[in-house]
Amino acid sequence: MANNASAEKRILINERNRLQNRFYKSSVRTLTKLYLKDLEVYKISRNPSDKEKAKNRLSLVYSLIDKGSKRNVFHKNTAARKKSKLASQLKIA
C-alpha cells in the first residue's frame, strides 16, 4: 500500500502504462496471426489478390510494431527482428 501521494500516483501511472503496453503487444500478436493466415491462403491459391491482402496486412503490422517501438513497448532491436521475420515469411511465400 502506498504511504504518500507520489507513491499512489506512481501506482496509477504504472497501471495505465501496463494497459497501454498490453494493447500494443496484443494487437501485434493478433495482426501477426492474421497476416500469417493470409500468407497460408496465398500459398494455397496463388491468387495475386491474396498476396496484396497479405501485403496490406503486413503494413498494418509494421505500423503497430513501429508505434510500439516509439513508445518503448518494444526495444528497437526486438521491433526490427519482428519486422524482418515477417518480411522473410512473405519472400518465402
Swiss-Prot record:
Keywords: Chloroplast, Plastid, Ribonucleoprotein, Ribosomal protein, RNA-binding, rRNA-binding. SUPFAM superfamilies: Ribosomal protein S20. GO terms for cellular component: chloroplast; small ribosomal subunit. GO terms for biological process: translation. The keyword Iron does not apply. InterPro entries: Ribosomal_bS20, Ribosomal_bS20_sf. GO terms for molecular function: small ribosomal subunit rRNA binding; structural constituent of ribosome. It is found in: Plastid, Chloroplast. Coiled coil: none annotated. Transmembrane segments: none annotated. Binds directly to 16S ribosomal RNA. Belongs to the bacterial ribosomal protein bS20 family. This is Small ribosomal subunit protein bS20c. It comes from Trieres chinensis (Marine centric diatom). The gene is rps20.
